[in-house]
Amino acid sequence: MKPNVQQVKTFLMQLQDDICQKLSAVDGGEFHEDSWQREAGGGGRSRVLRNGGVFEQAGVNFSHVHGDAMPASATAHRPELAGRSFEAMGVSLVVHPQSPFVPTSHANVRFFIAEKPGADPVWWFGGGFDLTPYYGFEEDAVHWHRTARDICQPFGEEVYPKYKKWCDDYFYLKHRDEQRGIGGLFFDDLNAPDFDTAFNFMQAVGQGYTDAYLPIVERRRNTDYGVREREFQLYRRGRYVEFNLVWDRGTLFGLQTGGRTESILMSMPPLVRWEYSFEPKEGSPEAALAEFIKVRDWI
């Protein structure tokens, strides 16, 4: 049975609407939409909320691109895809809050299909969500991972541990030997047991992101902070930039397929700083972050 591509696209566009609506309700600000077309085929809707009451920048992007040949980043680990036409669609978002006590969050759900005449289509879903705190709170991490586990539960006991580990492995800065944050879920190449089940799981992850994130935002948004906390937040945002530009497959795929650069780099924090050989003061809350983001079972 050929996957229902239109059904997936309809869901993704609705998901973008829903997430923007919920983030706006929390922030009080509005998203500004930029619709764009891709010369080689496809296009998308980029929505950005800037300098809001809670979020310094929140970007929620929908894209649907297609082409006659696969880019190198996609065929590197799937050589059988070379020479096929493809369609890729997804919703990708990153939220950078004003307050250092509210973590940055990222979520993504996507669908990919590659076809050639006389052969069965090759398709899969991917996605997940992950959390990057600047100051660690155990109850937030537990809530985040408990929500992730509850999303996975109906699809099998083994699903959460498998995709949690994949997330921990993926969001790792090899050159720093540290995690990007406390993880969450990450899955890719999902095409089993059948289209409907895989699609249902992708929907559950996409819809579950706000359940995981917004209670944490509400809990931390009014915590007082000063220059020290803000400086540390900007310094740690540097790790986000490093990961996205050096290790992230999605960024590479977007740039190699001639995607819209502004939308691809929408995940970048609006302000960031680096400091040579920075060492937080021993025993400080800033120093505690290194231990907090180490891989562990939160629930």
Curated annotation (Swiss-Prot):
Q: Which organism is it from?
A: Enterobacter sp. (strain 638)
Where in or outside the cell is it found? Cytoplasm
- Active site: residue positions: 106
Q: What is this protein called?
A: Oxygen-dependent coproporphyrinogen-III oxidase
Question: Mind telling me which HAMAP family this protein's record contains?
Answer: Coprogen_oxidas
Report the NCBIfam families cross-referenced here.
Answer: PRK05330.1
GO cellular component assignments: cytoplasm
Per its UniProt record, the required cofactor names are:
a divalent metal cation
Return the Pfam families for the record.
Coprogen_oxidas
**Cell cycle in keyword set:** no
- Marked site, Important for dimerization, at 175
Query: Which positions are annotated as binding substrate?
Result: 92, 108-110, 258-260
UniProt gene name: hemF
According to the record, the residues making up region (Important for dimerization) are 240-275
